[in-house]
Amino acid sequence: MKFARLVAVTLLFLVVSGFTDCYKPVTNSGLPKHIKTVAVPAFQFEAKGIRYKVETRFTEAVMREVIRRGNGLKVQGTVEGADAVIDGNIRDFAFTGVLLDREGRARVYEVNIVCGVTIRDVKEKKVIYDNQNFVFRDSFEFSQDPRSFFNEEDPAVERIARAFAESVVSAFVNGIGVKDEKK
């Protein structure tokens, strides 16, 4: 009897104290309601030097991430018919040795990529998100044995592209840093 009364009082306290309001569902409230189709045109490579398909990897990573986390948003490569456009550019690409072995050869390399992204609302004709200084780093190690050599630069670029896409799409879909119009 005492235990049942204690449980009832505890439950009543929890309900009255407002603990039921602690849960807030995650929604895509950061996006304007009219945005249903997002265009992701090919990113531009503005960095010095030539890197094979870096901009393509970033474009594809963003498209995959919008499909994965966009709550039903349609993705296309062309601007025509889109409600929003994600424009991106690779502003800098640096590949440097950061740790040397006993012979003075680089064993650990670091890839630094600086990207810019602008997300525009086509219907309202305004910028809803802009960050021209996304900086991503990843490191990888070369094998000492030349027979087991595998170029780790490509997987490192893929990891950076995925991290970039996750950041951009998260900011876009969740409304983090989305520019609000002052009233």
Q: What name fits each language-model region?
A:
Residues 1-8:
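Bacterial N-terminal signal peptides that target proteins for export
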Residues 8-18:
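Bacterial N-terminal signal peptides
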Residues 18-60, 64-67, 123, 146, ...:
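A structural "domain/chain start" motif
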Residues 27-28, 71-79:
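Short aromatic-glycine motifs in intrinsically disordered, low-complexity regions
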Residues 49-60, 106, 110, 150-163:
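Soluble non-cytosolic domains of exported or imported proteins
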Residues 61-73, 93-96, 118, 122, ...:
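Structured segments of extracytoplasmic/periplasmic soluble domains
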Residues 73, 81-133, 137-151:
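Surface-exposed short loop/turn segments
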Residues 125-183:
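A charged, solvent-exposed segment within the mature domains of Sec-exported extracytoplasmic proteins
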